[in-house]
């Protein structure tokens, strides 16, 4: 391997690595060992590239994985300690592979407790975030025994890293400029008291490393809660349904709303308004054959359109799907025949009504929920008064009727004036 990394330690196992380092500092960086604790320097020099390239990938990996192969170190002292000797950590990275490995380095967490002062640990992460391609290729190269364990960790880290930059809040929460104190605390607690002890004795073997790797790679996953909120595109199941549930059937019914108003179906509209606000799809309330209800209910559905309700992520939810009265009529007929659809039936209905299969599926889900509520007796029979809760709900039709009502008022006023 390159001479400067290996020459300083001729004897087989003279001293523990940290003492050996202070005794024989590396020729090209004549500074004492404590230097590894200096923040900027330690951070700016990736331990991975230094170790991996100077010691040569073969020997370093062999040593870290095997933990004991005495001869495998190519002349430097055998055994596990040699891979982590501080001279290899401090020396400037060799020009050829330094950059490539460096981008991968921050994600290479197992060594964080070893190399960096706790306070600075999180700081390297932002530096490594943008260039992901090298990291991916790096992950490809980790197939040897050395990183068998890490290999599985890396892809998830890649995923995390890709997601991290687009957060709205976290960068500050995670590593803000005043990160040092908080980060020191969190990292210390995260990687348990051990790493402090482990840092004092430079000798680690792979068995020790693996727990560290698990420890240090586990903490990052807290972000995922944000993902489904920040990126609604991610399929967080509950969310998809809820938003679709709220978004099902409405404004298309609005025109129907006006005619329903003229029909003056007071009890009906009140009931189905309550239902739809309770989250049901509010198609027909009682026995289906009474088809008059389906245009009406479209409208009543239109009334509780989600007005600026915000999801946890802070985005206002998308508008509810507008079903036309014809679509509602067909869906009701289908539901009357069959409460549960097969996949083929669902795709046929969706195709016939020019809806997506998801819309049909969710309409049926909501309709079944309402049907079960009715069966359970929550809803009074269609003819009876709404016994459930005598709360008076006046559905305000959203769209045309505003103008109609206004003109009626004007006419009444004009009629009242003379």
UniProtKB/Swiss-Prot annotation:
Location in or out of the cell: Nucleus
PROSITE patterns recorded: HOMEOBOX_1 (PS00027), HOMEOBOX_2 (PS50071)
Residue stretches of biased makeup (Low complexity): 274-294, 302-314
Pfam families in the record: Homeodomain
Main subcellular location of this protein, as a coarse class: nucleus
Single annotated GO MF: DNA-binding transcription factor activity, RNA polymerase II-specific
Keywords: DNA-binding, Homeobox, Nucleus, Transcription, Transcription regulation
Expression tissues: Expressed in CNS including rhombomeres 3 and 5, optic vesicles, and the medial ganglionic eminence.
Ranges annotated as biased composition (Pro residues): 8-17
Residues within the DNA-binding region(s): 316-375
GO cellular component: nucleus
GO biological processes: adult walking behavior; neuron fate commitment; proprioception; sensory neuron axon guidance; spinal cord motor neuron differentiation
Biased composition (Acidic residues): 259-273
Residue ranges of the region described as Disordered: 1-90, 214-320
Domain of life: Eukaryota
Compositionally skewed regions (Gly residues) per UniProt: 65-81
Protein name: Homeobox protein GBX-1
Organism taxonomic ancestry: Eukaryota, Metazoa, Chordata, Craniata, Vertebrata
